[in-house]
Design a protein with these regions (language model features):
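Generic secondary-structure transition motif, activating predominantly at the C-termini of alpha-helices
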Residues: 64-68, 81, 118, 122, ...
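Short, solvent-exposed, charged loop/turn and helix-capping segments
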Residues: 59-74
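Charge-enriched, short contiguous segments at helix-coil
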Residues: 72-127
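Short amphipathic alpha-helical segments at helix-loop
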Residues: 1-5, 65, 106-109
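Amphipathic alpha-helical interface elements
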Residues: 1-55, 71-72, 78, 89, ...
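N-proximal short alpha-helices
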Residues: 50-53, 57-60, 94, 101
Length: 141
């Protein structure tokens, strides 16, 4: 793997993390829409998807946890958050030697984590989508 390929792999993994965030935002937005529909003017309800538009992954998970009983999925999301935080804040720095060049030994090890992050992201997106099926039909009918 050359340096350009390494950076592409890191970018793909980070992009997959962003997709998890987007799916969580959609779940939260649709949950709020259903709540608004059920409340139907009986109570002021001003929560909306805009409230989480710029939210961190941690805040999205905290909000999601309040809208689901699926603690197993919440636990997976928290584990994923730890890996995503490592990737976002530490992984690339750990791949650099003191001169700022890529340490190929560590970069090779990181590649395994990047692949796992992408797979976990895919699996989580599917699980969140499945969780949304529990209420989505009520939103439109």
């Amino acid at each position: 793997m050359d340096e350009d390929r390494f950076h592409i792999e890191v970018s793909k993994a980070l992009s997959s993390c962003q997709l998890v965030e987007e799916v969580l935002k959609l779940y939260i937005s649709e949950s709020y829409e259903l709540a608004r529909k059920c409340i139907d003017g009986k109570l002021v309800f001003k929560l909306s998807g805009e409230d989480v538009e710029d939210a961190s992954l941690e805040r999205l998970i905290t909000t999601f946890r309040k809208l689901t009983d699926n603690e197993k999925l919440v636990a997976k999301l928290n584990k994923f958050k730890s890996e995503r935080n490592y990737l976002s804040h530490k992984a690339i720095a750990h791949c650099l030697d003191p001169m700022g060049n890529l340490d190929w030994g560590y970069a090779g090890e990181l590649k395994k984590r990047l692949d796992r992050i992408q797979q976990d992201s895919h699996d989580l997106r599917l699980e969140i989508h499945e969780e949304a099926k529990t209420f989505r039909a009520h939103l439109y009918f």
